[in-house]
Curated annotation (Swiss-Prot):
The keyword Cytoplasm applies. Pfam families: Cpn60_TCP1. Component of the chaperonin-containing T-complex (TRiC), a heterooligomeric complex of about 850 to 900 kDa that forms two stacked rings, 12 to 16 nm in diameter. The keyword Nucleotide-binding applies. Keywords: ATP-binding, Chaperone, Cytoplasm, Nucleotide-binding. It is found in: Cytoplasm. Belongs to the TCP-1 chaperonin family. GO terms for biological process: protein folding. GO terms for molecular function: ATP binding; ATP hydrolysis activity; ATP-dependent protein folding chaperone; protein folding chaperone; unfolded protein binding. Testis-specific. This is T-complex protein 1 subunit zeta-2. One of its GO terms (cellular component) is chaperonin-containing T-complex.
């Protein structure tokens, strides 16, 4: 009888082989769900929520986030895979596949009586060797635009169809290069992703500036301004109550009138300072003047500004304030006490665009903007969500490539090279731990096998061809998914992120080892005592 039964008679328990079988079954189940997603030829999954909302995706991270997983072990693997996405932005599906395959290969040896601890030791040794191979084969290059296009294309083609991937590749690379500043880490929050529900996904484009999701609030304001000065501010231009609850007593109606005028004058003085600055910088010229305020602007102030030809936008989002100063130059001001020309930014074109009942303000033709906008277009919500998810992954892939300063060949080439190296390395290990190394080598080959299978080719036949070519040519050979034949991944421009593969090896080994070493599963929480 299990020891826990003596303490809690209602506890449920699975021991030794039963516990391992439960865990391996869960890992294999999750693997089977995500298996067909892998690679550019992967298939879509349709997720239907409880409310009947439909989501079409082949992104492993989205799937694992949205799926309701009840099995504790499957849930653990899903969390590890989504954590991989949070850290590196890719590799979710590969993570689940390799963990499932590691457990499957280990199960073959455990069923013959090998202790899980010995396999775990073999896994650890294999991981260290695999990381050495990764270091040897990584390709260090100067990250020029052409290389980054290849990296982005490899990532994006696994998320969306090829035609759309080609369009997104260009805009994603250009957006990261625009916000990249020498000596600073790349901040992807400076790439605003704005969606518009019209046209097609392939109409997605990069705006060298900013797009705000609201327009001016006064009918007489210009809808289009060229060569405009831009004042970015966080100052209230409407009457606000005092912070302290104060009351006033006035003896006559005249005194009340005076009080109202004094309150109004406080706001009018602020507005007048903006008008004076506009007259100073735009005197005798056709230059425009735009005010973008984070706080409110009341109708009287809007009227005064409109009369002087100033375009004013109120209640801009906080996240856009920093982006505005980076895109247009100038400084965001919190007070109008010492307004100068130096506070102003500049944009070549500011115009309002109306789509249905929604209004958008485009701030374009900025000089060397350090913040840009990706304008995502699509005919429906599904397309928009799919394109946005793909863009996020593409941005992360480029950021990783620039920060790593190196890449590794994709198309399953790196996994074939690691497996080959591990089979050779196995012979130098004494004892039964070499079986763990062999299991690890076999498990890594799941990636090229599934890539070939999803493209409609025979996995075994393709893998044998690739391995033979790898041994003969001594180059990193992957699977050409258009022909099913071996190809040199680097020559074809198929690149994966170095940090994704490194993280993959670490997380898969740790989780697979931990799951293997579980010999008892107990459900004995407080709820089971009821």
């Amino acid at each position: 009888m299990a020891a826990i039964k003596a303490v809690n008679s209602k506890a449920e328990v699975a021991r030794a082989r039963a516990a391992l079988a439960v865990n391996i079954c869960a890992a294999r189940g999750l693997q089977d769900v995500l298996r067909t997603n892998l690679g550019p030829k992967g298939t879509m999954k349709m997720l239907v929520s409880g409310a009947g909302d439909i989501k079409l995706t082949k992104d492993g991270n989205v799937l694992l986030d949205e799926m309701q997983i009840q099995h504790p072990t499957a849930s653990l693997i899903a969390k590890v895979a989504t954590a991989q996405d949070d850290v590196t932005g890719d590799g979710t599906t590969s993570n689940v596949l390799i963990i499932g395959e590691l457990l499957k290969q280990a199960d073959l040896y455990i069923s013959e009586g090998l202790h899980p601890r010995i396999i775990a030791e073999g896994f650890e040794a294999a991981k260290i060797k695999a990381l050495e191979v990764l270091e040897e084969v990584k390709v260090t290059k100067e990250m020029k635009r052409k290389i980054l296009l290849d990296v982005a294309r490899t990532s994006l083609q696994t998320k969306v169809h090829a035609e759309l991937a080609d369009v997104l590749t260009e805009v994603v690379v250009d957006s990261v290069l625009a916000v990249r500043r020498p000596g600073y880490p790349i901040d992807l929050f400076m790439v605003e992703i704005m969606e518009m529900k019209h046209k097609l996904g392939t109409d997605t484009k990069l705006i060298q500036g900013l797009v705000l999701d609201h327009g001016a609030r006064h009918p007489d304001m210009k809808k289009r301004v060229e060569d405009a000065f831009i004042l970015i501010c966080n100052v209230s231009l409407e009457y606000e109550k005092t912070e302290v609850n104060s009351g006033f007593f006035y003896k006559t109606a005249e005194e009340k009138e005076k009080l109202v005028k004094a309150e109004r004058k406080f706001i009018e003085d602020r507005v007048q300072k903006i008008i004076d600055l506009k007259d100073k910088v735009c005197a005798q010229s056709n230059k425009g003047f735009v005010v973008i305020n984070q706080k409110g602007i009341d109708p009287f102030s809007l009227d005064s500004l409109a009369k002087h030809g100033i375009v004013a936008l109120r209640r801009a989002k906080r996240r856009n304030m920093e982006r505005l100063s980076l895109a247009c130059g100038g400084m965001a001001v919190n007070s109008f006490e010492d307004l100068t020309v130096d506070c102003l930014g500049h944009a070549g074109l500011v115009y309002e665009y109306t789509l249905g009942e929604e209004k958008f303000t485009f701030i374009e033709e900025c000089v060397n903007p350090c913040s840009v906008t990706l304008l995502v277009k699509g005919p429906n919500k599904h397309t928009l969500t799919q394109v946005k998810d793909a863009i996020r992954d593409g941005l992360r892939a480029i950021k990783n490539a620039i920060e790593d300063g190196c890449m590794v060949p994709g198309a399953g080439a790196i996994e074939v090279a690691m497996a080959e190296a591990l089979v050779t390395y196995k012979n130098s290990i004494k004892g039964r731990a070499r079986l763990g190394v062999q299991a690890f080598a076999d498990a890594l080959l799941i990636i090229p096998k599934v890539l070939a299978q999803n493209a409609g080719y025979d996995p075994q036949e393709t893998l044998v061809k690739v391995q033979a070519e790898h041994v003969e040519s001594k180059q990193l050979v992957g699977v050409d998914l258009n022909t099913g034949e071996p190809m040199v991944a680097a020559d074809a421009g198929v690149w994966d992120n170095y940090c994704v593969k490194k993280q993959l090896l670490h997380s898969c080994t740790v989780i697979a080892t931990n799951i293997l070493l579980v010999d008892e599963i107990m459900r004995a929480g407080m709820s089971s005592l009821k």
